[in-house]
Amino acid sequence: MELRHLQYFIAVAEELHFGKAARRLNMTQPPLSQQIKQLEEEVGVTLLKRTKRFVELTAAGEIFLNHCRMALMQIGQGIELAQRTARGEQGLLVIGFVGSATYEFLPPIVREYRKKFPSVKIELREISSSRQQEELLKGNIDIGILHPPLQHTALHIETAQSSPCVLALPKQHPLTSKESITIEDLRDEPIITVAKEAWPTLYMDFIQFCEQAGFRPNIVQEATEYQMVIGLVSAGIGMTFVPSSAKKLFNLDVTYRKMDQIQLNAEWVIAYRKDNHNPLIKHFIHISNCQQTRTKESDAGT
C-alpha cells in the first residue's frame, strides 16, 4: 500500500463519484477504479458500494476514511517537523556553560535564540571547563561555553568573549583610596583566586605577572566560581581579580579598581564537536557572533 492509494480513496470517498474524483486527481477513471480495487484487495474488505447510478461508503469504508485522513495529516505534520528540524527550527540544544558566562554573555544570546526559534528547547547545564570537554566528546552536550585552553582536536573552538580584569577588594581596604592598583600593591596582600583547574590560563597569567615583578602572590584561598570568590572578598578574607563583567554581581561590601601594569584578560570560547552536525549549533554561533559585534560597537561608542 502506497500513500497515493490513500489519497485516491479519500478523493473517491469525498466525491462519491469516480469521474469527479478522477478529474480532481488529474487522471482518467479506469486506472483510478483499478487502484481502488487493488486497495480493497489489500485491505481485505469492500470499502465502496458501487452501482450504475451511485457510489457510497460501506461501514468499513467510513472507518477506513477517518483513519486515512488522520494518517495523511500525521504524515504531513511529520514532514513539516522533519523539515523544520533540518533547518534548525525545531529540536533540542544542550548547552554547557561556566558560571562566569552568565554575567553578560550568555543571557542575551539565549533570549535572542528563543525569540527567533521558539520551537527549539534549550537545556542549560552549569559545568566546569574540564568536564565540559568530556561531556562534548561523549555527546552529552551540543555546545560548551568554557575557558581556554582546550586540548582535544576533535573539538571546534570559536572565541566567544574577552573581558579585561579589574581588582575586587573589600570596601574598607586602604587600597580603595587609589583609583588604580599596581602589581607592587599586591605584593603583601592576601589574594583569593579562581582555582587553576577552573580557569587555568587566567590563573597562570596572574602568577606570571607577579613572578615577573619579583614575588610570589600570597594566595590564601581558591574557589571554583566567581560568585564564591566575590563572597570571600566581601567577607574581608582578601582581594581578587575578576572580569569587568563580574561587577554586575552587586555587592555593597566590594569595591572594584582598575589594575595598572597588569593586563589580565578573561576569555571564554564556544566549543562543539567537529562531527556534530546539529543545525541548531549553527544558529547559536550566528547569534553569538552578532552579539559580539553589537557589544564591540557599543564599547566603541562609549
From Swiss-Prot:
InterPro entries: AlsR (IPR054793), AlsR_PBP2 (IPR037411), LysR_subst-bd (IPR005119), Tscrpt_reg_HTH_LysR (IPR000847), WH-like_DNA-bd_sf (IPR036388), WH_DNA-bd_sf (IPR036390)
GO biological process terms held by the UniProt record: acetoin biosynthetic process; regulation of DNA-templated transcription
Residue ranges occupied by any HTH lysR-type domain in the UniProt entry: 1-58
Gene Ontology molecular function: DNA binding; DNA-binding transcription factor activity
Residues in the DNA-binding region annotation: 18-37
tRNA-binding as UniProt keyword: no
Pfam families in alphabetical order: HTH_1 (PF00126), LysR_substrate (PF03466)
UniProt-listed Gene3D superfamilies: Periplasmic binding protein-like II, Winged helix-like DNA-binding domain superfamily/Winged helix DNA-binding domain
Coiled-coil annotated residue ranges, if any: none
Keywords from the named record: Acetoin biosynthesis, DNA-binding, Transcription, Transcription regulation
One GO cellular component term noted in the UniProt record for this chain: protein-DNA complex
Family that this chain belongs to: Belongs to the LysR transcriptional regulatory family.
Function comment: Regulates the expression of the alsSD operon for acetoin biosynthesis.
NCBIfam families on file: acetoin_reg_AlsR
PANTHER family: HCA OPERON TRANSCRIPTIONAL ACTIVATOR HCAR, TRANSCRIPTIONAL DUAL REGULATOR HCAR-RELATED
Name of the protein in its database record: HTH-type transcriptional regulator AlsR
Organism expressing this protein natively: Bacillus subtilis (strain 168)
